[in-house]
């Protein structure tokens, strides 16, 4: 199965368009319709060139108390040589459109759609869009919570297409969960997973 990911492109609604999309925030979750991610609600971060973003979650925004999540929109030749300004923050990148060049630990990784990277604190990573097309990805950030006697986790760079999803029991193969980190690996204090529902799944 080839995954398809949604990536916002911005723009403005037509003046004759009926606007019925509504975002819903609760203490447990948020539903953000794609039509709400327009040019007028983009933000910018320091040290990022030719890049804008949509803030999906930030600490104390209802359902989010410990993490932030952005959808990054990087133009050709854009990116950052100093993307993370918090030495205590860990991050996950997930590519939904385009190609990213990630440099970390003296290695260069070319990440395409479905690409996943876990970046522990103080990784010193950089990310550039070295193509002629737009790059869009999710960036999830969280302050790492160390535990005495447990080492910090290592960098992970992989792709969703290289990991077989775990099918949930009694779902006839219609509900799968792709895990990038084993739940028993207690070096990790957060997990980003992909849940897939096939038609007919509940």
What are these regions (language model features)?
Residues 76, 88-101, 105:
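Glycine- and acidic-residue-biased ligand/ion/polar-headgroup-sensing regions
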Residues 92, 105-121:
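Short acidic-glycine-tyrosine-enriched beta hairpin
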Residues 2-66, 132, 136-191:
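A short, N-terminal "cap"/entry segment at the start of jelly-roll beta-barrel domains
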Residues 71, 108-110, 124, 194:
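Well-ordered beta-strand positions in beta-sheet-rich domains
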Residues 50-59, 68-87, 180, 193-202:
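Conserved short histidine dyad/triad with adjacent acidic residue
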Residues 127-131:
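Asparagine-centered strand-capping/turn motif at beta-strand->loop junctions
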């Amino acid at each position: 199965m080839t995954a398809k990911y949604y990536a916002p492109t911005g723009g403005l609604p037509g003046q004759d368009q009926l606007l019925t999309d509504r975002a819903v925030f609760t203490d447990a979750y948020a539903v953000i319709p794609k039509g709400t991610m327009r040019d007028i609600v983009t933000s910018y971060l320091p040290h990022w060139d030719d890049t804008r973003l949509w803030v999906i979650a930030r600490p104390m925004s209802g359902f989010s108390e410990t993490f932030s999540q952005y959808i990054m929109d990087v133009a050709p030749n854009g990116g950052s040589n100093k993307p993370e300004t918090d030495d205590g923050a860990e991050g996950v990148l997930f590519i939904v459109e385009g190609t990213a060049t990630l440099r970390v630990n003296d290695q260069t990784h070319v990440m395409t759609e479905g690409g996943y990277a876990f970046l522990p604190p103080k990784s010193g990573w950089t990310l550039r869009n070295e193509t002629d097309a737009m790059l869009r990805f999710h960036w999830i950030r969280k302050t790492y919570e160390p535990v005495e006697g447990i080492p910090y986790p290592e960098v992970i760079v992989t792709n969703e297409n290289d990991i077989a999803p775990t099918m949930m029991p009694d779902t006839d193969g219609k509900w799968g969960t792709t895990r990038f980190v084993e739940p028993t690996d207690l070096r990790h204090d957060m997990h980003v997973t992909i849940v897939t529902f096939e038609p007919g799944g509940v």
